[in-house]
Regions:
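Structural motif
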Residues: 102, 132, 141-143
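Glycine- and acidic-residue-biased ligand/ion/polar-headgroup-sensing regions
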Residues: 80, 90-110
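Conserved hydrophobic/aromatic beta-strand scaffold that supports enzyme active sites
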Residues: 73-77, 95, 116, 124-126
Length: 173
Protein backbone atom coordinates (compact mmCIF):
# COMPACT_ATOMS: atom_id res chain seq x y z
CA UNK A 1 0.00 0.00 0.00
CA UNK A 2 1.02 3.63 -0.40
CA UNK A 3 0.12 6.99 1.16
CA UNK A 4 -3.32 7.02 -0.54
CA UNK A 5 -3.92 3.33 0.24
CA UNK A 6 -4.11 2.21 -3.38
CA UNK A 7 -3.27 -1.47 -3.72
CA UNK A 8 -0.66 -1.66 -6.49
CA UNK A 9 -0.07 -5.43 -6.27
CA UNK A 10 -1.98 -6.02 -9.55
CA UNK A 11 -4.11 -3.99 -11.95
CA UNK A 12 -7.31 -5.64 -10.68
CA UNK A 13 -6.42 -4.74 -7.08
CA UNK A 14 -5.46 -1.21 -8.14
CA UNK A 15 -8.73 -0.71 -10.04
CA UNK A 16 -10.80 -1.97 -7.09
CA UNK A 17 -8.95 0.23 -4.60
CA UNK A 18 -9.45 3.34 -6.77
CA UNK A 19 -13.14 2.45 -7.19
CA UNK A 20 -13.45 2.19 -3.39
CA UNK A 21 -11.65 5.53 -2.96
CA UNK A 22 -13.97 7.32 -5.42
CA UNK A 23 -17.10 5.93 -3.76
CA UNK A 24 -15.73 6.85 -0.31
CA UNK A 25 -15.20 10.42 -1.62
CA UNK A 26 -18.88 10.52 -2.60
CA UNK A 27 -18.58 10.30 -6.39
CA UNK A 28 -21.32 8.84 -8.54
CA UNK A 29 -19.65 6.69 -11.17
CA UNK A 30 -21.71 6.84 -14.36
CA UNK A 31 -19.54 4.33 -16.24
CA UNK A 32 -16.41 2.31 -15.61
CA UNK A 33 -14.15 0.23 -17.81
CA UNK A 34 -11.29 -1.95 -16.58
CA UNK A 35 -10.75 -3.80 -19.87
CA UNK A 36 -8.67 -1.28 -21.84
CA UNK A 37 -5.31 -2.74 -22.84
CA UNK A 38 -3.57 0.27 -21.23
CA UNK A 39 -5.66 0.22 -18.01
CA UNK A 40 -9.13 1.64 -17.52
CA UNK A 41 -11.25 4.59 -16.48
CA UNK A 42 -14.09 5.86 -14.34
CA UNK A 43 -16.54 8.38 -15.82
CA UNK A 44 -17.86 10.61 -13.03
CA UNK A 45 -21.43 11.96 -13.08
CA UNK A 46 -21.28 15.33 -14.84
CA UNK A 47 -23.37 16.95 -12.09
CA UNK A 48 -20.29 16.50 -9.86
CA UNK A 49 -17.94 18.45 -12.13
CA UNK A 50 -17.30 21.19 -9.54
CA UNK A 51 -16.73 18.66 -6.75
CA UNK A 52 -14.30 16.86 -9.08
CA UNK A 53 -12.49 20.11 -9.88
CA UNK A 54 -12.31 20.96 -6.17
CA UNK A 55 -10.53 17.70 -5.44
CA UNK A 56 -8.47 17.06 -8.56
CA UNK A 57 -7.88 20.54 -10.06
CA UNK A 58 -7.22 22.75 -7.01
CA UNK A 59 -10.80 24.02 -6.80
CA UNK A 60 -10.81 25.84 -10.12
CA UNK A 61 -14.28 27.06 -11.06
CA UNK A 62 -15.69 24.77 -13.71
CA UNK A 63 -17.08 27.75 -15.62
CA UNK A 64 -13.45 28.62 -16.40
CA UNK A 65 -13.11 25.22 -18.12
CA UNK A 66 -16.22 25.52 -20.31
CA UNK A 67 -15.84 25.97 -24.05
CA UNK A 68 -19.22 25.05 -25.55
CA UNK A 69 -21.42 23.34 -23.02
CA UNK A 70 -20.96 20.48 -20.66
CA UNK A 71 -17.84 19.09 -19.02
CA UNK A 72 -17.14 15.41 -18.50
CA UNK A 73 -14.85 14.40 -15.61
CA UNK A 74 -12.96 11.11 -15.73
CA UNK A 75 -10.31 9.21 -13.84
CA UNK A 76 -7.81 7.31 -16.01
CA UNK A 77 -5.82 4.38 -14.60
CA UNK A 78 -2.64 3.75 -16.55
CA UNK A 79 -0.75 0.45 -16.41
CA UNK A 80 3.06 0.52 -16.24
CA UNK A 81 4.95 0.41 -19.52
CA UNK A 82 1.86 0.87 -21.71
CA UNK A 83 1.05 3.57 -24.23
CA UNK A 84 -2.38 4.86 -25.11
CA UNK A 85 -3.02 5.43 -28.81
CA UNK A 86 -1.27 8.27 -30.63
CA UNK A 87 -4.55 10.07 -31.29
CA UNK A 88 -6.58 13.24 -31.51
CA UNK A 89 -10.18 14.37 -31.04
CA UNK A 90 -12.49 16.47 -33.20
CA UNK A 91 -15.08 17.58 -30.63
CA UNK A 92 -13.23 18.10 -27.37
CA UNK A 93 -10.25 19.51 -25.58
CA UNK A 94 -8.89 17.81 -22.47
CA UNK A 95 -7.19 18.86 -19.28
CA UNK A 96 -5.11 16.23 -17.48
CA UNK A 97 -3.66 16.32 -14.00
CA UNK A 98 -1.55 13.57 -12.51
CA UNK A 99 -3.14 12.49 -9.22
CA UNK A 100 -0.98 9.48 -8.43
CA UNK A 101 2.30 8.22 -9.83
CA UNK A 102 4.14 9.41 -12.90
CA UNK A 103 3.29 9.38 -16.61
CA UNK A 104 4.82 10.38 -19.88
CA UNK A 105 3.07 12.59 -22.43
CA UNK A 106 3.83 13.17 -26.08
CA UNK A 107 1.89 15.85 -27.92
CA UNK A 108 2.17 18.06 -30.99
CA UNK A 109 0.20 19.26 -34.00
CA UNK A 110 1.66 16.83 -36.53
CA UNK A 111 1.71 13.05 -36.82
CA UNK A 112 5.38 12.96 -35.79
CA UNK A 113 5.93 11.86 -32.21
CA UNK A 114 8.67 13.82 -30.54
CA UNK A 115 10.20 13.83 -27.08
CA UNK A 116 8.38 12.57 -24.00
CA UNK A 117 7.41 15.07 -21.31
CA UNK A 118 7.46 13.39 -17.89
CA UNK A 119 4.76 14.45 -15.43
CA UNK A 120 4.62 13.78 -11.68
CA UNK A 121 1.82 14.13 -9.16
CA UNK A 122 0.24 17.57 -9.39
CA UNK A 123 1.48 18.33 -12.91
CA UNK A 124 -1.14 19.40 -15.42
CA UNK A 125 -1.33 19.27 -19.21
CA UNK A 126 -3.80 20.77 -21.71
CA UNK A 127 -4.73 19.00 -24.96
CA UNK A 128 -6.29 21.10 -27.73
CA UNK A 129 -8.81 19.90 -30.31
CA UNK A 130 -7.00 18.00 -33.11
CA UNK A 131 -3.70 18.07 -31.20
CA UNK A 132 -1.99 14.68 -31.42
CA UNK A 133 -1.30 13.19 -28.01
CA UNK A 134 -0.45 10.03 -26.11
CA UNK A 135 -0.26 9.10 -22.41
CA UNK A 136 2.45 6.66 -21.39
CA UNK A 137 2.65 4.48 -18.29
CA UNK A 138 6.12 4.59 -16.74
CA UNK A 139 7.34 2.17 -14.04
CA UNK A 140 4.22 1.78 -11.89
CA UNK A 141 0.47 2.35 -11.97
CA UNK A 142 -0.70 5.94 -12.32
CA UNK A 143 -3.92 7.92 -11.97
CA UNK A 144 -4.69 10.87 -14.23
CA UNK A 145 -7.72 13.06 -13.58
CA UNK A 146 -9.20 14.34 -16.81
CA UNK A 147 -11.88 16.83 -17.80
CA UNK A 148 -13.33 16.71 -21.28
CA UNK A 149 -14.15 20.19 -22.53
CA UNK A 150 -16.77 19.66 -25.23
CA UNK A 151 -16.33 22.02 -28.18
CA UNK A 152 -19.58 21.22 -30.02
CA UNK A 153 -22.64 21.86 -27.87
CA UNK A 154 -24.96 20.21 -30.44
CA UNK A 155 -22.81 17.07 -30.76
CA UNK A 156 -20.81 16.50 -27.54
CA UNK A 157 -17.76 14.28 -27.66
CA UNK A 158 -17.92 10.62 -26.67
CA UNK A 159 -15.66 7.55 -26.59
CA UNK A 160 -15.95 7.27 -30.39
CA UNK A 161 -14.41 10.74 -30.86
CA UNK A 162 -10.95 9.25 -31.25
CA UNK A 163 -8.91 9.45 -34.42
CA UNK A 164 -6.10 6.95 -33.93
CA UNK A 165 -2.86 7.63 -35.78
CA UNK A 166 -0.92 4.77 -34.16
CA UNK A 167 -1.92 2.03 -31.72
CA UNK A 168 0.24 -0.53 -29.91
CA UNK A 169 -2.69 -2.92 -29.45
CA UNK A 170 -3.81 -3.42 -33.04
CA UNK A 171 -6.97 -1.35 -32.73
CA UNK A 172 -8.37 0.22 -35.89
CA UNK A 173 -6.55 3.30 -37.16
Amino acid sequence: MNKLNFDISSFDAFFKSVNFYLIKCGYKISFLDNKRPWGGFFAIDESQSQKFSNQFFDGKKIDNFRIAGKLSPKILLIKPKTRLSWQYHLRREEIWRVFFGKVGVIKNNSNNQQKILFLKEGDQEKIKTEERHRLIGIDNFAIVSEIWQHTDNENPSNEEDIVRVEDDFGREI
